[in-house]
C-alpha cells in the first residue's frame, strides 16, 4: 500500500523511538543552531531532517580471531568474488514511486523532539579561501564524513569515555542528519554507512539526492549481534545540480589480492556550466601495522582513477578516510601523483602546506587517539577551494573526546566549496 512521504518518514522515526509520541507534545525543545558563517540560504529541498532505522540494542561481538587472521581468512574466501555478489540484497534500488519530497517543517520538528534533551550542536565556521571572484557559477560544496557505523560504535570500537546513551541510534541518526542539513552539501561522501537503505537513502532521496552504496564484502559489522547489515561507502549528489555520466564501484586490491576495502567513483556533469568532473569516495584499511597494505590500496585506487579521468583530463575530487597520517606512504602517493592532486585542508594552515592536527579524536581502552586520517583531494590545476569548514577546537570537543552527546561520530566532517578554474583547456 502506498504511504505518503510524511507518513512513511514518521513511521521510520517512531519505529525506533517508541516513547517519541510522548515527546512530541509541547514541552522543552532543543532548537537548531543558527546558520554558520559562510552557509548558503537553505533551499526548500535542504530544510528537512528526519530519521529511521533499526532499533538500538546492546551489541555482542562474535569471536572471529585477531584482525590479521580475520582479514586473510576473508581474502582467501573472496579472491574470486565481488562485494556485489556477497551482498546483492544491499544493492537493490528503492522504488522510485515513493521518492517524493519530505515536508521539511514537520519532519524537522520531529527531529528536534528526538534531540530535545541533547546539548546544542557544535558551532563551526567556514574560512574564506578565495583569491578572486571570477567564477560565474555557484561553488560545488562537498562533504566528507566517516559517520561511525552503528554496529561498530556499540559493539567493537570501545569508546570508553562516551556514555552508552550518546550512541543510541534513534538520536544519533538525527545528529548526523542535522550536521548534513546544516552545511547543505551538493555532494556527500560517507564511510561506515550501515543504515543506507533504511535511513539515508529514503530520507536523502526525498531531499533531492541520488545515492549509491557499495558495502564491504566482509564488513566487521556482520560480526556484531543484531547488526543492520554490512557497512560501506555511500555517495550522494543533488540531482538538481548534476547529471550522472558514469558510476564505477571499485573493490580495492593489494599485492594482487582483492581486499575488504572499496571505493565509488562517479563522473558528474554540472547542469549550470556543462563542466564534468569525477568524484570518488573510499575508506582504506585501518590499524597500525597495515601501512604497506594501505599504500598498495592507494596505488590501486590511483590507477583506477587515472583510467576513469583519462589521465587527468577530467578534474577529480577524492574524499576518504584513508586511516593514514600525512607521514605514511599512501599520503605521499596521492601528493605526488601524476593526477596533480592537492589536499584541500592544507589550505587552512598558515603556510598552506600543513594538514590539520587531527580529524579524529577518541578514547579507547588502549588509550587516547588523536590523528589526521581524513582528506579531500582535488585537481589543483582545474579546481580551486573557495572555502573550507574549520575544525572543532580541543575545548569544543571536550575532555571525553568523540563521539559524545554533542557530536555523533569519532571523525569530524570535512566540508569544502570548489569552483572550476577559468580557461580549462589551457590549464589541463
UniProtKB/Swiss-Prot annotation:
Mg(2+) binds at residue 192. Its cofactor is Mg(2+). Disulfide bonds: none annotated. Residues 39-55 have a biased composition (Low complexity). Its main location: cytoplasm. Residues 340-350 are annotated as: Interaction with PPARG. It is found in: Cytoplasm; Nucleus; Cytoplasm, Perinuclear region; Mitochondrion. Residues 1-72 form a transit peptide. GO terms for biological process: circadian regulation of gene expression; circadian rhythm; deadenylation-dependent decapping of nuclear-transcribed mRNA; mRNA stabilization; NADP metabolic process; negative regulation of gene expression; negative regulation of osteoblast differentiation; P-body assembly. Keywords: Biological rhythms, Cytoplasm, Hydrolase, Magnesium, Metal-binding, Mitochondrion, Nucleus, Repressor, RNA-binding, Transit peptide. Binds 2 magnesium ions, but the ions are only loosely bound to the protein. Gene3D superfamilies: Endonuclease/exonuclease/phosphatase. The keyword Membrane does not apply. One of its GO terms (molecular function) is 3'-5'-RNA exonuclease activity. Residues 21-66 are annotated as: Disordered. The keyword Metal-binding applies. GO terms for cellular component: cytoplasm; mitochondrion; nucleus; P-body; perinuclear region of cytoplasm. InterPro entries: CCR4/nocturin_mRNA_transcr (IPR050410), Deadenylase_nocturnin (IPR034965), Endo/exonu/phosph_ase_sf (IPR036691), Endo/exonuclease/phosphatase (IPR005135). Its EC number is 3.1.3.108. CDD domains: Deadenylase_nocturnin. It catalyses: NADP(+) + H2O = phosphate + NAD(+); NADPH + H2O = phosphate + NADH. Belongs to the CCR4/nocturin family. Interacts with PPARG. This is Nocturnin. It comes from Rattus norvegicus (Rat).
